[in-house]
Curated annotation (Swiss-Prot):
Gene: fadA4
Classification via CDD domains: thiolase
Lineage of origin: Bacteria, Bacillati, Actinomycetota, Actinomycetes, Mycobacteriales
One function term, GO molecular function aspect: acetyl-CoA C-acetyltransferase activity
TM spans (from-to): none
Designated name of the protein: Probable acetyl-CoA acetyltransferase
Family that this chain belongs to: Belongs to the thiolase-like superfamily. Thiolase family.
Native organism: Mycobacterium leprae (strain TN)
Amino acid sequence: MTTSVIVTGARTPIGKLMGSLKDFSASDLGAITIAAALKKANVAPSIVQYVIIGQVLTAGAGQMPARQAAVAAGIGWDVPALTINKMCLSGLDAIALADQLIRAGEFDVVVAGGQESMTKAPHLLMDSRSGYKYGDVTIVDHLAYDGLHDVFTNQPMGALTEQRNDVEKFTRQEQDEFAARSHQKAAAAWKDGVFADEVVPVSIPQSKGDSLQFTEDEGIRANTSAESLAGLKPAFRCGGTITPGSASQISDGAATVVVMNKEKAQQLGLTWLVEIGAHGVVAGPDSTLQSQPANAIKKAVDREGISVEQLDVVEINEAFAAVALASARELGIAPELVNVNGGAIAVGHPLGMSGARITLHVALELARRGSGYGVAALCGAGGQGDALILRAV
């Protein structure tokens, strides 16, 4: 049976909303990471056969953002590209689809990942084409409406998660403690050079003088503590338990991996980080988020023929602390063992990028350890979940 491998990958540092990457489009960022990933892999753009990129906020981004990024990165005009929108699952699903296409015999070399500029999301004048005869009109925020608002319950996803917390019974303190650990672990990882293998600097032109090199995630606050987070007001409900500190940050960034048929990689004399294993895809029974990563992981490990206890590296995207806490509890994993180098609460959550970011991070972490199983998992809007098993052998 054909096996797919992740040869290597690259990501940008993650910028805060209206932060260092505010002037870059999602495709600009994607092009940077595609070019960097190919260079790191020692793979010529000419042998790439397909490009799959996740992006959620595409209004105003121009036609085919994935193809924009591919062409700008030097991939040929004869190479097709696909833009995926599966909300927060997009970047991971792009990699999973690359694996599926390779195993199906369609391609041998696929570039896959995710890109997002939440800063560049425009405001929309809905129904303007048909005109307005009288009265006020409302301008809709593309970021909020198409990115962060649950269409099934007509409320922000944070409010939906707050409602589910009434059932899950996670306290404000538990969520604050988890969020603080995310910042502390991410800060320590940067200090220890853990992210050096995955992050490519972004050169930011200046009006005068040399370009500025943007090199580190700018949302991490090393001095964050549960005590400092305790002073924040609830974000979604009076007396609620979720605050801006226990929710993921609105951010900009991109991540790309090079996925290849293992035999092709051997023919080219390449090494690789990991083999790609089973993919778990779940949904329902409603649009809530908390259980989706756990459900997807359970499905993926079952398809892989292993147990949760055999997972050495577990990345669960921190859309909210409550999501990671709930999924860890359902899996029987201690929360401190999830996201050992911090997560989206600290580094940020560019919607289309995050699945690719955590997949790349699991791959690199397994490669550092030399063996073992890892999983990258996320919840997604509409009550869906994806998980991808990786193995270093």
